């Protein structure tokens, strides 16, 4: 019997995959537990439309990420912090600080987890920060740290 899996089934297949299962296994285990549905033409069409919708959603997300990457490329964010005489900061600049500065100065809301900071930003100067917007889509912008 051909069935479409609703979730991963060990030893049989992955979610939304159409597989051949023995009649008894399908009727007595997979269908009653809601792990699969019978592969009728209606269910196959529903699965195809879901996959198409997911593909369109992914394309939109990739397009938005590319657009945001273009915007971010030319940005310079300035942070003013207290520093000692030799240019060393009292503390360090974290991705949280940079994300907040992006939000206030450029009106861009980027999660701090997507920012890849240089090892340690503990002095005054200019640093490049990488943003991982989507798998395979990255961008860089400049962070300028100045003394108060």
From Swiss-Prot:
- Quote the InterPro entries the UniProt record gives: Ribosomal_bL9 (IPR000244), Ribosomal_bL9/RNase_H1_N (IPR009027), Ribosomal_bL9_bac/chp (IPR020594), Ribosomal_bL9_C (IPR020069), Ribosomal_bL9_C_sf (IPR036791), Ribosomal_bL9_N (IPR020070), Ribosomal_bL9_N_sf (IPR036935)
Name the SUPFAM superfamilies on file.
L9 N-domain-like (SSF55658), Ribosomal protein L9 C-domain (SSF55653)
Top-rank taxon of the source lineage equals: Bacteria
| GO BP term (any one) | translation
Q: Which GO terms describe its molecular function?
A: rRNA binding; structural constituent of ribosome
Q: Would you name any one GO CC term?
A: ribosome
Q: Which residue stretches, if any, does this entry annotate as coiled coil?
A: none
Which controlled-vocabulary keywords does the entry list? Ribonucleoprotein, Ribosomal protein, RNA-binding, rRNA-binding
Looking up Pfam families in the UniProt record yields:
Ribosomal_L9_C (PF03948), Ribosomal_L9_N (PF01281)
What exactly does this protein do? Binds to the 23S rRNA.
Give the protein family: Belongs to the bacterial ribosomal protein bL9 family.
Entry's NCBIfam families?
A: L9
Q: Which PANTHER family match?
A: 50S RIBOSOMAL PROTEIN L9
What is the name of this protein?
Large ribosomal subunit protein bL9
What organism does the record attribute this protein to? Ruminiclostridium cellulolyticum (strain ATCC 35319 / DSM 5812 / JCM 6584 / H10)
This protein's encoding gene = rplI
């Amino acid at each position: 019997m051909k069935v479409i899996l609703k979730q991963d089934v060990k030893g049989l297949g992955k979610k939304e995959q159409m597989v051949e299962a023995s009649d008894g296994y399908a009727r007595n285990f997979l269908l009653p537990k809601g792990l699969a549905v019978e592969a009728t033409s209606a269910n196959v069409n529903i699965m195809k439309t879901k996959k198409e919708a997911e593909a369109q959603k992914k394309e939109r997300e990739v397009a938005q990420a590319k657009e945001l990457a273009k915007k971010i490329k030319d940005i310079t964010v300035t942070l003013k912090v207290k520093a000692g005489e030799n240019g060393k900061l009292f503390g360090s600049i974290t991705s949280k600080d940079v994300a907040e500065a992006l939000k206030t100065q450029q009106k861009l809301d980027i999660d701090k987890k997507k920012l890849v900071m240089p090892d340690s930003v503990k002095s005054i100067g200019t640093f490049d920060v990488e943003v991982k917007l989507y798998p395979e889509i990255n961008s860089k912008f400049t962070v300028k740290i100045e003394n108060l």
